[in-house]
Amino acid sequence: MHCESPIVRRKSRQIMVGNVPVGGGAPISVQSMTNTETTDVAATVEQIRRIQTAGADIVRVSVPTMEAAEAFGLIRKQVNIPLVADIHFDYRIALRVADLGVDCLRINPGNIGREKRIKAVVDKARDLNIPIRIGVNAGSLEKDLQKKYGEPTPDALVESALRHVEILDGLNFYNFKVSVKASDIFMAVAAYRKLAALIEQPLHLGITEAGGLRAGTVKSAIGLGALLMDGIGDTIRVSLAADPVEEIKVGWDMLRSLKIRSKGVNFIACPSCSRQNFDVIKTMNDLELRVEDITVPLDVAVIGCVVNGPGEAKEADLGLAGGTPSNLIYIDGEPSQKLTNENLVDNLERLIRAKAAQKQAQLEADAKNIIARA
């Protein structure tokens, strides 16, 4: 019932964002961006920690002013996850946060200014071994490109990116990644596909300003999913008008669904119908909240009846197939025990945690054996 992923990753250079490798065959990293006032250090630190707990590899922070830059320095001292500073308009802010411990600088070609200013940022980044993201956005293209193309197009996005790739190449600076974001799915996908064939730098994927939690998730899943299935992309950010924690959850769900990278419990659940022997929807909602702290990859099937229940349950690490008078639990493909509907969620949580602990212990033992044989 399981099909191996046919995805072949695009080859790219590798950069390091803090201790996280991006590109060069490294696992695709998941990131989000804070939406607090950066000058509110306590609130921003608290949000970064929640984002990290949700599974983020990297967090971006907007730094619009010098006051925010000083706050960024205080934030940097209080968190232990790689931080990207999002810089627009004033290149001097980039120079300042570089001295304050930033792990990556995001600059926007559409508003960062003349090549002289870019060179100043590059020189500072080179001295401190800080990578840069060239972040092209359809909503803020350079004025000459707006005039040339009349409106944002995939070619306009790519031309903007290549213009700044050429500048950095000319400065013998290769420690950078690139993004070409648009809110239009077709525009973004076309731009990324074209750019992926033209450069060897790692690509940061995103559908910008995708929308609220539901619509934004759908748009991002379609756009990023298409690119990821092509093997394009080295780090992703799902842009949602929602709690940044939700961006991390959706990002991980995408990677998990495409069998690119796994973390936590992957639920396989039926949509439910009148054949269900227990309330599938309520059971799922409760379980997802209860076990979201589990990080070990684990497939759990929750199927309400005997039509597809046994088949799906056998394929999972742990599966529940609804039945009358009792539901049947499968562990590693074998029938294990029966559960009634009484305290069903409590019992399922207990079994899931036990299986996760067993799998974690096995992973650790395997890792030790590999080290011992090396």
From Swiss-Prot:
Functional pathway: Isoprenoid biosynthesis; isopentenyl diphosphate biosynthesis via DXP pathway; isopentenyl diphosphate from 1-deoxy-D-xylulose 5-phosphate: step 5/6
GO molecular function, one term: iron ion binding
Co-factor binding details: Binds 1 [4Fe-4S] cluster.
Keyword Mitochondrion assigned: no
Gene Ontology biological-process entries: isopentenyl diphosphate biosynthetic process, methylerythritol 4-phosphate pathway; terpenoid biosynthetic process
Family assignment from sequence similarity: Belongs to the IspG family.
This protein's name: 4-hydroxy-3-methylbut-2-en-1-yl diphosphate synthase (flavodoxin)
Organism of this sequence: Cellvibrio japonicus (strain Ueda107) (Pseudomonas fluorescens subsp. cellulosa)
Gene designation per UniProt: ispG
